[in-house]
C-alpha cells in the first residue's frame, strides 16, 4: 500500500489508501502535535471529502480542540480564514488537482504555515501510528460561513471603481472555486461573467481539475472565442 504521508501533505486513493479511520487518527495526531485548543477546517468538492472531514474533525474534537468547520470552500478561503481569524491551526481536506479517486489533507499551523516533510509531518505521522481506531460518538463543531468576509478581503486590494467593463469567462472545474468567485464578483457588476462548470461535482464531469493540462483548458479557450471575451 502506498504511503499517504507525502513531502507537503497527506494524500492517497480513497478508500484503499486513505479512509475515515485514518482521517480520524490524523486529526487526533495533528492536535496532539501542535498542542492547540482551536482549529479551522474546510473541504473541497470531491465525493469523499464530507465524510473524511467529519472523521478528521471527530479526531480533533476528541483531543479537546474547539473546531470551526467552514464547509465547502477553496483552499484559498481556508488559508484566509486561518490567518484573518487568528486560528492556531487549520486543515483542508483536498487532493488539489489530482484525479477524482484521490483525496488528502493539508495541515497548517498559525500564520498559515504548512506542515511538510521537513517541518511537522513526520512528527504527526509518528503520533498517528500510536493512536487507536476511532470510537463512536457525537461530532461537536461550530459551522461558519466565511464567504462574505473573504470577498471583502479580496476586494480590499483593488479600487472597484477603477475596474473597466469587460467580458470574462470563468471555469470553476466543478470545484469550490465557483462559490468564492460568485461571492467576490457579485461586487463587480461592471464585469459580464460567463460561468463554466460552477456547480460543485466531485465526479468532475466536464474535464479534470488540473488546469495545467491542455485538454482541461480547451473548453474555456473555446468559450472565450465564442463569447468574444476580453479574458478567461
Q: What kind of region is each of these model predictions?
A:
Residues 11-14, 44, 73, 106, ...:
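Gly/Ser/Thr-rich beta-alpha loop segments that engage phosphate groups in nucleotides
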Residues 39-103, 184-232:
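N-terminal small/polar loop signature for handling phosphorylated ligands or for N-terminal nucleophile
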Amino acid at each position: 500500500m502506498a504511503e499517504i504521508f507525502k513531502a507537503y501533505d497527506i494524500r492517497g486513493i480513497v478508500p484503499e489508501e486513505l479512509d475515515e479511520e485514518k482521517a480520524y487518527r490524523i486529526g487526533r495526531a495533528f492536535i496532539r502535535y501542535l498542542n492547540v485548543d482551536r482549529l479551522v477546517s474546510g473541504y473541497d468538492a470531491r465525493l469523499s471529502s464530507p465524510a473524511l472531514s467529519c472523521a478528521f474533525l471527530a479526531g480533533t474534537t476528541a483531543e479537546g480542540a474547539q473546531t470551526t468547520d467552514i464547509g465547502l470552500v477553496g483552499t484559498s478561503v481556508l488559508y484566509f480564514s486561518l490567518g484573518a481569524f487568528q486560528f492556531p491551526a487549520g486543515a483542508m481536506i483536498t487532493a488539489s488537482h489530482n484525479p477524482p479517486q484521490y483525496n488528502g489533507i493539508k495541515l497548517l499551523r498559525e500564520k498559515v504555515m504548512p506542515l511538510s516533510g521537513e517541518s511537522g509531518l513526520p512528527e504527526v505521522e509518528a503520533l498517528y501510528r500510536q493512536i487507536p481506531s476511532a470510537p463512536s460518538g457525537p461530532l461537536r463543531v461550530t459551522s461558519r460561513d466565511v464567504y462574505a468576509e473573504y470577498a471583502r478581503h479580496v476586494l480590499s486590494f483593488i479600487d472597484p471603481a477603477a475596474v473597466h467593463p469587460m467580458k470574462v469567462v470563468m471555469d470553476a472545474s466543478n470545484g469550490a472555486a465557483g462559490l468564492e468567485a460568485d461571492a467576490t464578483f457579485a461586487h463587480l457588476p461592471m464585469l459580464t461573467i460567463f460561468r463554466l462548470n460552477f456547480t460543485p461535482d466531485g465526479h468532475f464531469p466536464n474535464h479534470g481539475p488540473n488546469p495545467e493540462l491542455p485538454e482541461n483548458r480547451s473548453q474555456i479557450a473555446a468559450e472565450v472565442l465564442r463569447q468574444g471575451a476580453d479574458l478567461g
